[in-house]
Structures are given as C-alpha cells and as structure tokens.
Amino acid sequence: MFELLEGWEWKEVADALKGFQVVAAMITISELGDLTRFKHPRQLMGFLGLVPSEDSTGTRRRQGAITKCGNSHARWLLIESAQAYRNTPKVSAKLSKRQEGQSGAVKALSWRAQDRLSGRYRRLKLRGKRENKVIVAVARELCAFIWELHQLMGDDLPASTQTHRNP
C-alpha cells in the first residue's frame, strides 16, 4: 500500500497535519471524495455529522448530541486523529521529517492547526467537559483545517481531483 502512495497527489496533504497521517488521510479522502463540493467548512462538518443536533420551538433552542449523519468511517478517523491534539503543540522529529519539502503556507497552516486545536482541548477540559465531548469538538475543528488545507493545495492538485472546483 505504501508503494502505491508514492505517486499519490494527496500525500503532501496527508503529511502536513499532526495525527492525520497517510493511511487516515487516504481513507478519509476516499470516503469523502471531492472536497470542492463543500463551499464552507461548516458544510463538511455537517456532512460528517460533527455538528450538534437541534430541537427548537418558539424562543427555546436546545442543542443535543452530534447528528452522526454522513460517513461514519471518515467521522471515526477524524475523531481518532483528534486525539493527537491532547498534547502540547510541538513539531516532533517525525512530523518535521514528513513536512520536508512542503511549502511554507502548508507548514504555517499545520502549526496554526496544532496550536489552536491543542489550546481548544485544554480550554474545554479546564471548563470540566467530558473527554469524549472535547475530542469530538477538536475533531470538528480538525475537519475545518483539512478543508482549508484542501483549498490551499487545490491549485497544485491534478485536474482529476478538481472536477467541481468553483472560482
């Protein structure tokens, strides 16, 4: 499988983020397909079921558990990948090696994601939120960073992956 990945156009995207390595990226991208169909990261979050359900009536608004609609494999992988952000942000030797040869914009996005997601994890835990709820919240934001990384890399990807790209 790793031999097939050498020529894969998404390899750079897969190597950019902490906790989101090649196999997870390959499965997620194959499950989600073309990310250009989502005009905003909130649409991708909703597609994956990482948004809260809502029960509203009149002036009362109640948000519940995540909707769990969409692809359960991709949602599960994002939740598993989000566990890497429990630790303090740092560029490890492994991550640094994976990021060799990548553009400065990709590395900056990776660091911004690491810093924000680790901070979000710590803040939610300090507020007394349960571990699973915190990890799902981090996975939801990780989803947005994956969408942004796809937008950033979109011009460099082959035309076959840009079939629905909107200007």
Locate each region found by the language model.
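A detector of single, family-specific signature residues
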Residues: 1-167
